[in-house]
Curated annotation (Swiss-Prot):
Protein name per UniProt: Large ribosomal subunit protein uL2
GO annotation, biological process: cytoplasmic translation
PROSITE patterns on file: RIBOSOMAL_L2
Matching InterPro entries: NA-bd_OB-fold, Rib_uL2_dom2, Ribosomal_uL2, Ribosomal_uL2_bac/org-type, Ribosomal_uL2_C, Ribosomal_uL2_CS, Ribosomal_uL2_dom3, Ribosomal_uL2_RNA-bd_dom
Region (Disordered): 223-265
Alphabetized SMART domains for the sequence: Ribosomal_L2, Ribosomal_L2_C
Quaternary structure (record): Part of the 50S ribosomal subunit. Forms a bridge to the 30S subunit in the 70S ribosome.
Species of origin: Vibrio vulnificus (strain YJ016)
Top-level lineage group: Bacteria
Ribonucleoprotein among keywords: yes
Keywords: Ribonucleoprotein, Ribosomal protein, RNA-binding, rRNA-binding
GO CC aspect terms: large ribosomal subunit
Keyword NADP recorded: no
Family annotation (PANTHER family): LARGE RIBOSOMAL SUBUNIT PROTEIN UL2M, RIBOSOMAL PROTEIN L2
Length: 274
């Protein structure tokens, strides 16, 4: 893995910083694990924009990633590491002893030829998946299930991890990167180690077009809009908005709490760091 700063051969290359991984597969992905991935431009079934700043971008296939890791007791050999355009982490194509191939999130340090396993008897080794009741306290984990059998939901992006800090009855307590500590059922599964490609955060796209390739459209500031379009809009000449920052719908931003799921509050031991 190397961080490469491009030579300023043009204005669009001047600020580009790339993450280069020579270990990634340079050919086509494994076709049986590809699915159609249609774009919706941030619009719902009524054609209305529900998520702003989405549109365009390069065509992509979805890689079907195994987030459940339920093939217990069957060892799998890592065939290759691959780039995945749908996520910041890299993925690994693994071949199970029974002949089945699956994609998984590639943890830090994984290489082609490694052997991984899942189940209660799997050794404590990066890339192996176990129920959290079988993982030692203090271990670094990723791809954590919130609901047993549903599949991993936490710590899935590049460089992400959580730490298992306590075990209490049918629950374990984990500490997330944000500083939040929460309880999850100990029957849920997690994978040992942290997600690879942690250098992803160091990249610089270098130009607006690189964002457009990724399907990200520009963000227009509210203070340059008209009053009909945004609470900060209007005024004679350049203004500061005249009020505390709000969203286009008048909801305060910059630190305003919007969490409303009181049903799961009891599982949060400590709120995330500010």
């Amino acid at each position: 893995m190397a961080i490469v700063k491009c030579k300023p051969t043009s204005a669009g290359r001047r600020h580009v910083v790339k993450v280069v991984n020579a270990d990634l597969h340079k050919g086509k992905p494994y076709a049986p694990l590809l699915e159609k991935n249609s774009k919706n431009g941030g619009r719902n079934n009524n054609g209305r924009i529900t998520v702003r700043h989405i549109g365009g971008g390069h065509k992509q296939h979805y890689r079907v990633v195994d987030f459940k890791r339920t093939k217990d007791g069957i060892p799998a050999k890592v065939e290759r590491l691959e780039y995945d355009p749908n996520r910041s982490a890299n993925i690994a194509l693994v071949l199970y002893a029974d002949g089945e191939r699956r994609y998984i999130i590639a943890p830090k340090g994984m290489q082609a030829g490694d052997v991984i396993q899942s189940g209660v008897d799997a050794p404590i080794k990066a890339g192996n998946t176990l129920p959290m009741r079988n993982i030692p306290v203090g271990s670094t984990i990723h791809c954590v299930e919130l609901t047993p059998g549903k599949g991993a939901q936490l710590a899935r992006s590049a460089g992400a991890y959580a730490q298992l800090v306590a075990r209490d009855g049918s629950y374990v307590t984990i500490r997330l990167r944000s500083g939040e500590m929460r309880k999850v059922l100990s029957e849920g599964r997690a994978t040992i180690g942290e997600v690879g490609n942690s250098e992803h955060m160091l990249r610089e796209l270098g130009k607006a077009g690189a964002s457009r390739w990724r399907g990200v459209r520009p963000t227009v500031r509210g203070v340059v809009m008209n009053p009909v379009d945004h609470p900060h809009g209007g005024g004679e000449g350049r203004t500061s908005g005249g009020r505390h920052p709000v969203s286009p719908w008048g909801v305060p931003t910059k630190g305003y709490k919007t969490r409303s799921n009181k049903r799961t509050d009891k599982y949060i031991v400590r709120r995330r760091n500010k």
